[in-house]
Structure formats: C-alpha cells, structure tokens
C-alpha cells in the first residue's frame, strides 16, 4: 500500500465463466456444437480471443467486434506469500453488449450459458417486460428450446436481488456460491458454528 510491489511473473490467457465452460467442453472432446457469443474490441486482446476460440474448435460467429471499445480484461495480482488475489477489471466492450444481436434460431447449440450477471452493464439494464435485459435474453433462449445456465460475479453490493432475481425465472441451472446465494435470497450465511 503506497509502496513498490514487484511483479515476479506474467501470463496471458482468455477466461471468464462462458469462455472457461466452452474451453473445458472443447478439451473434453464435446461432440456437440460450441459457440461463443459476446463482444470484443478491435484490438490485440480481441483478436487473441477470436483466434483462441478457433484454435480450440469454438465457433466465434456470435462474437462481434466493437471498434469503439477495448476488449474487456482483468489483471489478477496474486501475492507470493499466501496466494491472496486482487482483481483489477476493465469492463470494456462487455459493458456495451446487450445480446440483441444474438439469434438463437441460427445456433445449433443446446444450452445457453450467461456469465457474469452484475458485470455486464447492458445485460444488467432494466427491461420493461422481463425486469432486466439478462432475463429477457435467457427467456429468448428458452423460447428457442435451449436449456439455460447462469453464473454471477461476487461483489459487495445490494444489486443482486434486483438484477439476478428476474433472471432466475428463466434459468435451468444456476451457479452461485454461498455469498452470492445469500445476497440473492436475503438469507444470511451462517458464520461458523453459529
């Protein structure tokens, strides 16, 4: 804190819930279509993601390029002693993607995985019919016959019920840790043996 901290190593990779799920399925040899959806910037990181998808057998046809925004990225700093991590995140192009360009009828996929609510500003925006744009997108996927799954980001805020709540009606599989579940439901997490 306000002193020099040395960096002892660096690596680059793609990540995030949807990408990690796709990559894991590709590496397991999934015998069904894998397609990415979202938005990257017209920059080296965006090109890296598109190339990495293709290299791993993930069809990037639903990943658009925004010429006016940076590709979203996270710098993760891990303490050498103890392994505690701090995440510095640039929302970039992800903040502007609302999924309106996604045509589920043009996809051969069977499941739509949305991640991360609370980190995608346009997806988290209000929708007059569904509550949020994310809920509308999940409903559209279900209407097209896809199963849906959802992952959220852990944050210290009061937005969970407002943003995640409406989406739950349109989710087949929801991935929450105990802290996220507590914030969505309003039920306090038990503290140890109490």
Where do the language-model regions lie?
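Ribokinase/PfkB-type carbohydrate-kinase core domain
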Residues: 39-41, 50-65, 69, 76-194
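Hydrophobic alpha-helical segments and their boundary regions
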Residues: 4-7, 72, 104
């Amino acid at each position: 804190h306000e002193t020099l901290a040395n960096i002892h190593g660096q690596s680059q990779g793609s990540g995030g819930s949807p990408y990690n799920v796709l990559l894991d399925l590709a590496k397991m040899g999934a015998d069904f279509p894998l397609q990415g959806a979202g938005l990257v910037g017209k920059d080296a990181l965006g090109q890296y993601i598109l190339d990495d998808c293709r290299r791993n057998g993930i069809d990037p046809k639903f990943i658009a390029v925004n010429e006016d925004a940076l590709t979203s990225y996270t710098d993760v700093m891990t303490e050498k002693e103890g392994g505690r991590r701090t995440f510095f995140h640039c929302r970039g192009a992800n903040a502007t993607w609302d999924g309106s360009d996604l045509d589920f009828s043009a996809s051969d996929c069977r499941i739509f995985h949305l991640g991360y609510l609370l980190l995608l500003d346009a997806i988290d925006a209000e929708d007059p019919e569904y509550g949020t744009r994310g809920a509308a997108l999940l409903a559209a996927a279900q209407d097209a016959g896809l199963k849906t799954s959802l992952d959220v980001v852990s944050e210290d805020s009061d937005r969970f019920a407002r943003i995640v709540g409406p989406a739950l009606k349109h989710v087949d599989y929801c991935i929450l840790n105990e802290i996220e579940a507590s914030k969505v439901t309003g039920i306090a997490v038990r503290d140890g043996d109490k």
